[in-house]
Amino acid sequence: MSITRKGLLGLASGGLLAAAVGTTARPAVAATARAPERIGPARRTLIRNADVITLDAQLGELHGTDVLMEGGKIVAIGKALAVDGAEVVDATGMILMPGMVDGHRHIWQSVHSGAIPKISPVINDYINWKMRVDVCYTPEDAYLAQYAGGLLSIDSGVTSVLDFCHTFHSAEAVEQAVKGLRDAGLPGTFAWQLSRHPVFGPGGSATMAQIMTNSGQAPDEDHWRIAEHVRSLFSGDDDLLRFGLASPIYQDAPISRTAETFARIRRLQPHVLAVHYHRSDKPFSDQSLQNVRQMGEAGLLGPDFHIAHGHGMHDVELQMMRDNDSMICATTMGEHSYPFPSVHGRAARAGVKVGIGIDTGVAFTHDYFQHVRGSYYNLFRTDEGKQIALSMSAEDVLNMASGRAAAAIREARAGTISVGKRADVLLLRTDRLDFPVMRALAERVANFSSYSDLDSVWVAGVARKRDGRMVGVDMAALKQKVNAMTERLHAQADTIRLT
């Protein structure tokens, strides 16, 4: 049986799918490339003479400006800074901007790029594909998928992610998933989704009735034990990668079930409580969960609460999200074909913390600049969205993928080029023949930049990409490992029969 992407709206609600700093002289240090699994402390680095998109409302755009990074943070911004003992990067003619933020990505799916492309009839097979591949993963596969997916994010200029990990059903696999993402050095929040053990495996079969019955129930106790184990893998909010959990949302089920699940999750104190949420227009009772308004009235929202998608939310629901300091991520490229328009424009206008994300690498490009532009074009689906779009500046559009987006995953440490912020920065080349030399910097980047322009990436002050290549990573060898793994996983998935 084939389930469409639209069918995910129901299944995803269940458990299964579910001021400058003083600069004292120091001896010069030779640059050293480190492998990701040995990512060392940030080096003192001076980016010299860059044109800077700060996305800091107090600073704006700066031309011919120096930025000093030390101890993983931005410690000075100014003209012709006098600095000794730092690696100097000549950024003349280049654009420096904050690292980008993805507020909803299934990192593990990044290695399956092209398995279910959006522009293809097979997009309707997404759920069938996901359910079958999901159960074939080993702990070793979980590590490789998360490690490679984390590197792909950094390679594309994404330096913070909310990883909605809706797979892996053993403590060993989830632990390796965390280790892979941590070894990749990608900051953000790892939010593993509580669910239930699948009712089938490689070589097995199941009916959709069995799957639906299983997915509509509360997480099993083994998954709660795994969640407690995952919590033990994180030391606290000072980590680059922080602990989160993702919950099923039981639309059409008693709201008390969601309340009980949320309460138990919050006892584990996740940095983010993430949910997939798709609006339902069915008639509802006070006991049957249908919308965010009910969750708000039940006291389930809060500053840890994060919604992925949320398309079609009503104004009163957006007001509740704002008043509870809750967060939203719109995956605008994928949502363009959804029955209701993406919510990011209206959410931003309402004062909600909102950003954008890719969602899944199986269907969409990792060139995040395309998603930035897609978030703008998506607004033109409706007359209301068009008016919002026409009121936005290029800085507003970039902010939806950086400063505003960072706030929308509770990542206050990043998102702008400001003194004291974490040194997550991107350096873009501008020497491409068709890269414009006129208009504001943000307008040039928002309209014209692409993955090919990305020269360098620093994460917490550590150079992860230089001269267009990842530092200390043999990407060709990694690709061979990934291809071998995905070929095996897909072959195993083909042995599963869903009817």
Regions found by a protein language model. Give the residues of each.
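Glycine-enriched alpha-helix->loop->beta-strand junction motifs that scaffold or abut catalytic
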Residues: 267-270, 300-303, 320-329, 349-354
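Active-site gating loops and adjacent loop-to-helix segments of metal-dependent hydrolytic enzymes
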Residues: 113-142, 197-217, 281-302, 324-327, ...
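Metal-coordinating catalytic core of metallo-dependent amide/deamination hydrolases
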Residues: 36-37, 172-316
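His/Asp/Glu-enriched, well-ordered alpha-helical/loop segment
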Residues: 298-300, 304, 345-432
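A conserved active-site cap/scaffold subdomain adjacent to cofactor or substrate pockets
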Residues: 329-331, 335-339, 343, 350-352, ...
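Alpha-helical scaffold segments that flank or form the walls of functional sites
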Residues: 114-165, 169-187, 222-237, 481-485
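Active-site microenvironment of metallo-dependent hydrolases
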Residues: 2-65, 70-73, 80, 399-499
